[in-house]
Amino acid sequence: MASDVDTADGETVILNCIDSDGSKLDGDHEEIVISTAEVSQWDLTSLSHRPIIKIKANRQRQIIFSAHSAVFVLSRTIEWKFQASLFFGVDKLLLVCQSWLEYVTSEVSIWPPQLCLEDLVHIWDYGRENAIDFIPQLTGYLARNFIWMASCDSFHNVPFELLLSCVKQPCLTVDSEKHLCDAILLWLAANTNPSDRLSSTGDARPEILTEIRTSLLSLPFAAGKRRCPFFSKFAERSVVAICSLAASRTFILADILGGGDCNQLRIHLTEYTKILDLSGCPQINLPLLLLNMLPSSNNLDKLLMKKLNQLSLKLEHHMDISRISWETFPVLTFEAVQVVDVSNCPMLHLEAAIEFFSKSFPSLTTLKAAYILTFKTMKLYQLLQRCPLLSDIDLTVDSTPVIPAKVSVISSFPAVMLQISTSPNDEIRPDVPAFHFSRQLSNITKLILEGRTDFYDSDLQNIAECCPSLCCINLNACTSITDSGISILVLKCVELHSIFACDTSFGHNCVLSLCRNISRLDAVAMKMADNTNSLAYKLQILHIGGCKGINETSLLELISQTQRIRSLCLRETQLVDNCLYKFSGSSLEMLDVSDTKVSCHAVGHVVRGNPLLKCLIARGCRHLLQEENDILGNSPVLYYELGKSCNLEEISLGWGFSFFSLEALRPAIKMLRTFIVGLGGSLGKDGLKLVPTFCPWLETLILYFQVVSDSVVRNILETLKNLQVLALCYCFGEISSLIFQSSAPRLRKLKLERVSTQMTNDDLLILSRNCMNLTELSLVGCKRLNSESQDTISNGWPGLISLHLEDCGEVTAQGVTSLMNCQALEDLLLRHNGLGIDRNFIIRAASRMPLLRKVAVDVCDAKDGDFDLPDFPDRNFLHIVKIARCNLKRRTLGSTKSGTCTTPVHAETLILTWDSRKLSRTVVKERL
């Protein structure tokens, strides 16, 4: 805001306050004249919307005049010093402004963006300079809104003293300790000279790191920060503490705290907390969570500590939680909490935690509890009863690799039932209803059960009866439910508009239910011309990829009625051109027709009528290749239509996709984020060189069977500054060590499969320095690597959550040693990397890596010829174990009798999958 002083007469002066950005203000644009004699009558809210304000003041009131400081009305700046306020009689104005500041910072409902962070910093500077006592209010306000403050572009300009003061506030409110740590590290990185990052001597700023409760960080985050210059020691201690807590079978406070207080285990949970994010914390168990819901004190009384320890022992021995007296714990209530995320918390007894969520979080609407296998789906009704306001639940687990339509089963073994409860009331038979008989209607609108093989038709029927408001259901890879079970849900939940049912038994009965007129339940409804009352007509999302039970006729009937659909996945179905020609919707944003028999013309027909299309997935469609010569201006009709009408964010193509197709697509891919080219596509080196130019905002680039070279890959890494995922799989043209010298600090996922056979340990070391933030790494066919590469991987990428090594020389010839230091791993595949893996490797890995859910190995690498299989107690967090076995095939060398050699040929794969009820063992032909 600019200001100047005009002389009106001998006794009065006028201060003109002009907003430099007044064009952006709403409201009356006329100037207004006010007087300092009427400060008490000023309407600050109204004044804040005026582009020009004229303030009249009596000259006789001047005592001292100077310039250059700051006072604020809302977020509008007037340049003057504190002493100059007396000239205009603004001492009263200061009181008004201070009163306003007290009001606005005390209002929980005020949304922070109404206040500019830069202005708040100026207010803080002004108050500190002039010893005004509103600083505590201001720091408290920023502490309560710390997440907003950290998200502001000017966060790095916040003075250290102000930041430290905010972090030390008891009311500091953050979603998780990870968010606090990340914000502090970002601030330090922006305010620390590179030469000072390796040493904290002479700098008081690293003291702020001691305010981080490192024992409460998520394991992947803490492990990944072990390479952070000024946080490496803290991160190392954090990982040790987390793994120690996760390994403790019992929660004994005295042992954990060593006689100290509980502050380091106190989650930042305040009366202002809206989101509680504990995801990825294997150290979080029920007693530790309960500790944070009890009244805060430096030391718990002995009786309460004893109760916590007893609770831990009861849960360890799988005691029926209905026998536990929860009322003995005086938990606090946090009214503001609406979202709780405990995904990837394997030690948390979710069933028992629900008891406390219902008491401490009465406003809870969203619960994310993905990858918690111990939660039995039969307890879902208990969750709905205890937390009646819940509207969104996520119980996702990893999808089983044993999808009936995708594998050839050689043999299967009787399921081993998991008996962990001492309660005679806990039924584990799949045919027993999972809910109590006393129905209570739930407010659930969104339910995610992806991958839950312990979910049956009876469970689905009870959901249909108890959740009439259900709008979105995710049943992807729920292989235990049937077509009839899903159809009953569809019939009863008439509010459904989003269905995810990929790789299930979704079939003809479901189609009948969707296409039936919801106001008429007779057979005539299917034949009526007006289908606007059918559920299919109202669908917004329908994902049924991989569902082989839908024939062409049913699919045509279904698609012809989905006129309002926004997202449609039909991959690996019996989809043909006629079905797409029947599609009359115009709101489509995502279409997946991969591995179907559709043609360019049919897909082009859909594209032409849906200009809002942002995502097209059409890999594996061989019929797209047949129309390669059907071109308009050297481009197939499909790509011509895409380039003419769409602004794509994701595209996945294969057969028939060429350099000319890329040229035709150019207008549509300027803002592309994900680009996948699969088998049958042929961009060539020239086409790949154009990708960074055509798609400068790419974040994901995945190439299968493409021709690549050093220059192509280096151009991609050096030009695409936002690239986070790069996969080069089975590509033609060897890439050398030159590409590993390109820096890609934003890269998070890297796959090099059969493209870098000459990679050495030194190359891997260079790669770890230039792509230091990887969280997922897959190397296949790097035959020159040896056991030393384990050190490079564990030291270079300590925060890895996924590691796949296959046909990589002698990496495991001396056993698996250093890789055990990748303690945040969730997915580990080691195959054909050298004979040397110990028999007990799977059990040992599960005990050392608290978050490990998936393991894949090959008997060829087993030092003793086999692997021990974990029992229920030994599996820890394991969900899927795949053990491949090869046969040695004799291969004759030439026509001589000088000798023969053998080569391993895949024979079968043993798959073990655990869920909340049982262990399933299956042998399949495929190498999974």
Predicted regions, residues:
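C-terminal capping region of solenoid repeat domains
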Residues: 279, 287-288, 293-335, 349, ...
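Alpha-helical scaffold in the C-terminal half of BTB/POZ domains
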Residues: 2-14, 23, 60-66, 72, ...
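Generic preference for well-ordered alpha-helical elements
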Residues: 48, 64-65, 69-76, 87-98, ...
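Intrinsically disordered, low-complexity PEST-like regions enriched in Ser/Thr and acidic residues
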Residues: 15-46, 252-269, 322, 331-332, ...
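Eukaryotic basic, amphipathic alpha-helical target segments in cytosolic regions
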Residues: 79-80, 89-92, 101, 105, ...
